[in-house]
Amino acid sequence: MAAGGGGGGVSRAALARPPIHRGTSAPGGAIAAAGGDGDGDEASRLLGRAQPREAPYLIPRPDGDLAVPDDLQYATLDLTGDPVAVGAGSYGSVLVYGSVAVKTLRAGFGHEAVMTLLAAEEARSAGVRGVVRLMGLSAPLRQLMFPAYEMDMDAYRRSLTARPGHVVHALGRVFTELGRALVFLNGRGLSHLDVKGGNIFVRTCGNMVVTAVIGDFSLMALNSRSALADPRFRLARRKALKITSLARSPPTGVLLGHARDRPTRVLMDFINGRPPPPGPLPYEVGLAIDLCALGHVLLDVALGLRPQRGQALTREYAVEVLARRCVLFAALLPPGSGPSAEALAGDILEEELAAGFREGVASSRPGNQPPRTVAPLLELVARFCGEDGGARFAELAA
């Protein structure tokens, strides 16, 4: 299972676990389960609710603050059954109890809780699919609770041995839905900034994806379309959370990520030493980052590629990324989808870096041609990663 809030996936063999039998206690009664697209139905039943949550996650107050409903909060956790560990790292850990995933944070609880509440409320109020639903939170325990999923998209990619027509059709459907969800969130002032296979959670039927949602809002930031001033998010027992500086001004490292899945213009600004503009993250930049990253996840799934991460982020590495992208996109995507190598070489200000780029283009090889069956997925990749910053897809998704 994969946790809706991040933490990676486990093999199908780990799914043979007893279901949980009871929920947890909360200041305002039993915890309320949230769902959408069926992602919380089973968890809702196990936690004592017949239907997924329809009530707001945030309630506006006259003083401008936002109150978190009592029935979404809990002070103690009492889920029976053997938990399955599906992720651990510097952020904390994720345990799955049957149909429920519990993410316990060592640090950053306030930021992630606020961003998760905002994303969940926007998606709930608009009926948007493709965004994981929050089931509960606990400030004392530094926990967030989500529906558990079968695996993440990276695990699904590894499980595929072939990509027949029905698999391609299902992937096109769920990735289009994920793209629309990201367009929606960015339009509401929320840029995810950490879209990757490990943060997309899926349920399958055989080798076909049935449901996919984006989760893990630990790096989410407000963009220039956000109308939020400086509200407090009021919890039970007079506790409150606030929007952090990370949400208002994401650092350069977050914007650049692992470089490989970032928009060409973001990488070019880094290569040429241009700092991010002052003020909030521009909406167009946040949207382009999210859609370009989603496109690279789809590219990896369509071609069975293993994403390369962990390289030191230098200008030389960014040049290498762009050189490989020019060659790969020219070979795989529809004409005009990728960046022009000649134009990019002229845009690089330092001659030494420009020369390195030209050498990288000359030495890169696109690899084997993909099967024709995945052509519809590559067309969708082109829309996500196009040089227009994803604007074409955003127009279609509006």
From Swiss-Prot:
Changing residue 103 to R: Loss of kinase activity towards host H2AX or IRF3. It catalyses: L-seryl-[protein] + ATP = O-phospho-L-seryl-[protein] + ADP + H(+); L-threonyl-[protein] + ATP = O-phospho-L-threonyl-[protein] + ADP + H(+). The keyword Kinase applies. GO terms for biological process: symbiont-mediated suppression of host innate immune response. Residues 1-10 have a biased composition (Gly residues). Residues 80-398 form the Protein kinase domain. This is Serine/threonine-protein kinase UL13. The lineage of its organism: Viruses, Duplodnaviria, Heunggongvirae, Peploviricota, Herviviricetes. The gene is UL13.
